[in-house]
Amino acid sequence: MKTLFVLISILYAVYCFSSEEDVDSAYLANELEPVEDINSEQYAALEPKEEQERSCADMGQDCKDDCDCCLNIATCNCWFGRYFCSCTFGDYQTCLRKKGKCKRNRPQSCPRSNLNRKKG
């Protein structure tokens, strides 16, 4: 029973690959016409708009300094000094620095971790 199932699976796979090649070769030889979209006029007015540049960069995106990064604790980390800069996670001190120097994307409050506080 297993061998019959394997044999049928192999035959089906060969059939699928051979039929794809027939369609591809027929399309390349212009034997098949490309399908036209009937509703193309309906969507002509809905052309995509140019994406506006964001005021801040998400984690992993390019940045020039800490003020370019969105999150309060995000810092602009650069390789080899000033090359290949991207926003990465910082800490509480990063947030305080950004609060002091940034005019745009200025943090309103800095989150403090509860891990280091002593209880009792």
UniProtKB/Swiss-Prot annotation:
Q: How is it modified after translation?
A: Contains 6 disulfide bonds.
Q: Name one GO molecular function term.
A: toxin activity
An example GO CC term for this entry is:
extracellular region
Bridged cysteine pairs (disulfide): C56-C70, C63-C76, C69-C87, C78-C85
Tell me the compartments it is located in: Secreted
Q: What are the entry keywords?
A: Disulfide bond, Knottin, Secreted, Signal, Toxin
* Residue ranges annotated for the Agouti domain, each copy included: 56-95
- Signal sequence extent: 1-16
Predominant location: secreted
Expressing tissues: Expressed by the venom gland.
Q: Which residues form the propeptide?
A: 17-54
| Family the entry assigns | Belongs to the neurotoxin 05 (agouti) family.
Domain remarks in the Swiss-Prot or TrEMBL record: The presence of a 'disulfide through disulfide kOR' structurally defines this protein as a knottin.
Protein name (database record): U13-lycotoxin-Ls1a
This chain's source organism reads Lycosa singoriensis
